[in-house]
Design a protein with these regions (language model features):
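Conserved, mostly hydrophobic/aromatic
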Residues: 28, 84, 119, 171, ...
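Catalytic beta/alpha-barrel core
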Residues: 4-6, 59-66, 79-90, 103-117, ...
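Active-site beta->alpha loop and helix N-cap motifs at the rims of alpha/beta catalytic domains
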Residues: 4, 9-13, 19-21, 27-34, ...
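Active-site-adjacent beta->alpha loops and helix N-cap segments on the catalytic face
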Residues: 36-46, 66-71, 85-101, 111-118, ...
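Catalytic cores of alpha/beta
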Residues: 11-19, 69-74, 95, 112-123, ...
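C-terminal alpha-helical cap/extension of soluble enzyme domains
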Residues: 149-210
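Glycine-rich phosphate-binding active-site loops on the catalytic face of alpha/beta enzymes
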Residues: 24, 29-32, 125-136, 175-195
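Glycine-enriched alpha-helix->loop->beta-strand junction motifs that scaffold or abut catalytic
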Residues: 20-24, 77-82, 98-106, 121-128, ...
């Protein structure tokens, strides 16, 4: 089982860094913008250092701009614990091959089973399908995810774009074991009203004996 925190918000990182639940961080330019961070290599350098300082195993940073190859090289140069996120486009496939380190890449923005097969052919470490966006489209999401599971053996299917804990639990039931979880789901993920009620009863019983 592998969970990655899908957030560029430092408070989210700090919140779960000691839980033992999240092994790594994943980000993209949209998440940086929402966190009011500049999309730049200087920001990436800072995020890389902060992630390692909180004992995350790695951080995934996405290419941007007009020269993906140059940005990807700079991400790799941050250190051995950086992984390059590359959109699953024709240009992205060329980039994975040109970089020559598929084990340090993730194909992201995946919306079809064939992209999983491409990821497997390229030997990338992760392929990230966008579950909620597929659910909201007219595509057959269950067939797509079945195809991803069937085609990816070395490559890990890193399920992204979750809107709710219910979606997360549904995918767990289908056998998925590798997820990016957005910071917006942390409250629902880390607590359950019935558990909280049980704790109150336990504490009340203990207090009555004091």
């Amino acid at each position: 089982m592998e969970w990655l925190l899908d957030s560029a918000t430092l408070e989210d990182w700090k919140r779960v860094s000691g839980t033992g639940l999240f092994s790594a961080i994943t980000t993209n330019p949209l998440l940086l913008a929402r966190a009011e961070l500049q999309v730049s290599m200087q920001t990436y350098k800072t995020l890389y250092q902060q992630a390692l300082g909180m004992d995350y195993e790695h951080i995934q940073l996405q290419v941007f701009g007009d020269d993906w190859f140059h940005v990807a090289q700079q991400i790799l140069d941050l250190g051995e614990y950086s992984i390059v996120k590359i959109p699953a486009t024709e240009a992205g496939f060329h980039l994975v091959t040109r970089l020559g380190v598929p084990e340090r890449t993730t194909l992201t923005g995946v919306y079809s089973a064939r992209m999983g097969a491409m990821a497997e052919c390229l030997g990338v470490k992760y392929v990230a399908p966008y579950y909620a966006r597929l659910v909201e489209s007219e595509r057959d999401v269950e067939a797509i995810f079945a195809g991803l599971r069937a085609s990816c053996k070395r490559t890990r299917v890193l399920v992204a774009s979750l809107r709710s804990v219910d979606q997360f639990e549904h995918l767990l039931g289908l056998g998925h074991r590798c997820f990016t979880i957005p910071g917006t789901l942390l409250n629902d993920l880390l607590s359950d009203p019935m558990t909280e009620a049980a704790v109150e009863q336990f504490e009340a019983a203990a207090a009555a004996q004091i």
